[in-house]
Amino acid sequence: MSPRIGVMLSGRYRLHRLIATGGMGQVWEAVDSRLGRRVAVKVLKGEFSSDPEFIERFRAEARTTAMLNHPGIASVHDYGESHMDGEGRTAYLVMELVNGEPLNSVLKRTGRLSLRHALDMLEQTGRALQIAHAAGLVHRDVKPGNILITPTGQVKITDFGIAKAVDAAPVTQTGMVMGTAQYIAPEQALGHDATPASDVYSLGVIGYEVVSGKRPFTGDGALTVAMKHIKEPPPPLPADLPPNVRELIEITLVKNPGMRYPSGGLFAEAVAAVRAGHRPPRPNQTPSSGRASPTTIPSSTQARAAVACGTKTPAPRRSRPSTSGNRPPPARNTFSSGQRALLWAAGMLGALAIIIAVLIVINSYAGNEQHQPPTPTVTDTGTPPATKTLSGFPAAYCEYRVNWTNHKEISNSGLPKQAARAQLAGATDISPVAGQT
């Protein structure tokens, strides 16, 4: 039987008002009869109460969130399983009742946040996530609906319902996607393990939305949106935003998780630098592994691709001296003075042709570049700075896009089969009840 007003759970928590409903359960305002305080009680939906997997996930949420103690994380007070009107056991989670409003509701009213409030919210959220990341936990469903804003501007992260300990066995099936499509990291959309960098990506999507008033990726369905996170670059942010703010969001939304800020704390430090008027620091990037291939002369198409991605053509390898026995030196070719003159002229013409071709390529890209705002690129730590990208986004995106779009698990039909069957809309979406505040 579904919970209703007046129901008492375990002889202690009396349900008073339905606040919100979501994929896994309902959130109620309740009264703790022992301590005389108001609390929030998340009650698992009746259709899931007999499902051992959902019960275990619900217990995991209680254990996970109870480990975290920070002003920016809604506290967990209790967990229990109670008979409800003799209709079987129902699991519930007792949490801090936050006097606040979900960020998604704020955005529905205001469209976007002021830059000052947006950066403050992002820094607070990053610092709160760092507590989980330092404990080896990943939220995996960071989105505006899980960020509460109090009247004083304090951020409270809620709903660690699909959080997972990095070193523990996953509750979900291998390859199953957990998260909300509009804010999901590319690696999560592919069914790969989420990391703290996945939470940072989701927070970057939120950052894009709060400063621009729109999400970077939209579509007709969850799968369409998820595929855009995997394959497409975000649209350029409004030109009226400060360059360091645009750079911060662009760094955070690169496809390669190894090239993002690796934790909420480092993301928060980057936001703090931007708030102080500085450029965001570059994350410690994990360069792609691989052996260098033999040097070849690139075609004109390859050369243009290299310029667009901010890469440099590798220098030709020097020939190694032979270690074999002494060999007689090759016979010298002798040329007449006329032949030498012809060879010299041919060499000059060849060099001139190369110079002209290079100038044509440079001029063509310079013409294109005039219409795009200059954006500093992200480079690997310890390597020379990359050349400026022409897309307006860091070179890391252009470099890694090929790896993601050619991933062995991606087919022409889209996501992996298991991922496509998963509920990309999120298992723990929380939607306020109509008429409730």
Curated annotation (Swiss-Prot):
Membrane topology category: Single-pass membrane protein
Please list the residues that bind ATP: I19, A20, T21, G22, G23, M24, G25, Q26, V27, K42
Highest rank taxon of the organism = Bacteria
Name the GO cellular-component terms: plasma membrane
Q: How is it modified after translation?
A: Autophosphorylated.
- Residue ranges, compositional bias (Polar residues): 285-303
Alphabetically list the UniProt keywords. ATP-binding, Cell membrane, Kinase, Membrane, Nucleotide-binding, Phosphoprotein, Serine/threonine-protein kinase, Transferase, Transmembrane, Transmembrane helix
Per UniProt, subcellular location reads as: Cell membrane
Q: Nucleotide-binding as a keyword? A: yes
Q: What does the record give under GO molecular function?
A: ATP binding; protein serine kinase activity; protein serine/threonine kinase activity
Ranges facing Cytoplasmic side: 1-341
Which stretches does the entry tag as region Disordered?
277-334
Task: Tell me which EC number(s) this protein carries.
Answer: 2.7.11.1
GO terms for biological process? regulation of primary metabolic process
Q: Which reaction does this enzyme catalyse, per its entry?
A: L-seryl-[protein] + ATP = O-phospho-L-seryl-[protein] + ADP + H(+); L-threonyl-[protein] + ATP = O-phospho-L-threonyl-[protein] + ADP + H(+)
> SUPFAM superfamilies attached here?
Protein kinase-like (PK-like)
Q: Where is the Protein kinase domain?
A: 13-272
Does Metal-binding show up as a keyword for this record? no
Question: What residues make up the catalytic site?
Answer: D141 (proton acceptor)
> Which stretches face the Extracellular side?
363-437
Give the transmembrane ranges.
342-362
* Protein family according to the UniProt entry: Belongs to the protein kinase superfamily. Ser/Thr protein kinase family.
Q: What does this protein do?
A: Protein kinase that regulates many aspects of mycobacterial physiology. Is a key component of a signal transduction pathway that regulates cell growth, cell shape and cell division via phosphorylation of target proteins.
Kindly provide the name given to this protein in its UniProt entry.
Serine/threonine-protein kinase PknA
Q: Which organism is it from?
A: Mycobacterium leprae (strain TN)
Report which gene this protein is encoded by: pknA
